[in-house]
Regions:
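Helix-to-loop junction immediately C-terminal to a conserved catalytic motif
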Residues: 13-14
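Conserved ABC transporter NBD signature motif
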Residues: 21-31, 38
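Catalytic Walker B motif of ABC-type/P-loop ATPase nucleotide-binding domains
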Residues: 125-129
Length: 214
């Protein structure tokens, strides 16, 4: 539910230091990674956007995903440009490449930043509500793309049916606490969800897919 601590938990995974204990990546404390090294491993999509890039072109923002690989004072390589163009095509924004981002709709902007994260070619994607502002076509396309991603994806979602259909492992949170984690069918049950959301739930299988109704 809203305000349960999902975004805060995610932020700790991209180097917001916890007040106690440690978080490790590949058995190495997060705080020991240098910025460039960490950015080559982890790409992040947050809910906030930097207003300083409002006048940037779409293609330039997506190309920023290659920044962790750029040599000091160097320019982006032809391979960097090729990678950026590939992911712009993947998320359906090639036709917007020469537009300034402040001219775009919310859904179009979201796809730009998703393309930027993918252009980073990380091992891990951290995505905070990536389906926000997207219509159903692009929600489904994004989730299929994330399923095909070769690394690890950690995503905050409010759409429980999308989570049921595309996620392997689900963590349910409430009031800053992890209540339950496991497979979709283990976690997304009326017994667990009804006390949290205070609405009745039903579940069913349809053509091999697990669905929730409320």
């Amino acid at each position: 539910p809203n305000g349960c601590g999902k975004s805060t938990l995610l932020s700790h995974l991209y180097r917001l230091h916890p007040s106690k204990n440690k978080i490790t990546l590949n058995e190495k404390p997060l705080e020991s990674y240098k910025g460039r090294e960490f950015a080559q491993l982890v790409a992040v999509l947050t809910q906030s956007r930097d207003a300083m890039i409002d006048d940037f072109l779409v293609k330039d923002i997506v190309l920023m995903g290659r920044y962790p690989y750029k040599q000091h004072f160097g320019t982006y390589s032809s391979e960097d440009v090729k990678i950026a163009e590939h992911y712009m095509n993947e998320v359906g924004i090639t036709h917007l490449s020469n537009e300034e981002i402040h001219h775009l709709s919310g859904g179009e902007k979201q796809r730009v930043f998703i393309a930027k994260a993918l252009t980073q070619k990380p091992q891990i994607l951290l995505l905070d509500e990536p389906t926000n502002h997207l219509d159903m076509k692009y929600k489904v396309a994004l989730m299929k793309q994330l399923r095909a991603f070769k690394g690890t994806t950690i995503v905050v979602l409010h759409d429980l049916n999308l989570a049921a259909q595309y996620c392997d492992h689900i963590v349910i949170m409430n009031n800053g606490t992890i209540l339950k984690e496991g497979s979709p069918t283990e976690v997304l049950t009326p017994e667990i969800l009804e006390p949290i959301f205070e609405v009745p739930f039903k579940t069913s299988w349809d053509e091999g897919r697990y669905h929730l109704y409320y």
